[in-house]
Amino acid sequence: KIKVAIKPCDLSRVFAASGGLPLAKRAPQRQAYRLIELQRWSDFLQVPMHVQPQFFPVTPDPAARLIIAAQIAHGNEVALNLSTAIMRAMWSEQKNIADEATLIGIACDADLDGKQLVKSAETSAVQGDYDSNTNDAIAANVFGAPWYVYKGEGFWGQDRLDFLENAFLAK
C-alpha cells in the first residue's frame, strides 16, 4: 500500500523560481490548447468539469491553508478528501474557493468543523507549513502541479501516473 502525503504549496512562487508562467501570461496557442486538453481529460476520466470555471484564476492560498489545517487536525487522508472536494467545487460546481463562506461550506459538507478549520488555517503555524512546503518544492525542482515524488524522483502531471505506478512496481 502506498501512502500519499499531500503538501500544498504556493505555485506562484514555484513558477517564479522555475521559469513557469501563470496562465494569463502564456502564449495564446498554449492557452487554447490547455482548454482542449482539459476537455479531453474530463471526457477520458468521465469527470464533469467546466474547462473555464467562473472563479478561475483565483488565489488558491486560503484553500491550500485549509487543506494544511485539516491535515494537522485530522490527518492526511482527511486532507486528501478535502482537497478533492475543493477541486470539485471549483472545476465542477463553479464555486469560489477563495471565499471563506464557500470554504466553510465545503469543509462542513466533508463532516468537518468548517468555521474552526478556517480559523486554524489563518494561524502562523499553518502559514509556516505552507511556506515550508513551498520552499521544499522549490528545492526539489518542482515546476508544476500535480507533482509526485517517489524515492526522490519527481513525476509531473496526471498523465505521468503510469510511470509512477511502474516505479512502485519496480521496487
Regions found by a protein language model. Give the residues of each.
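C-terminal cap of thioredoxin/glutaredoxin-like
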Residues: K1-K7, I72, N81, A85-K171
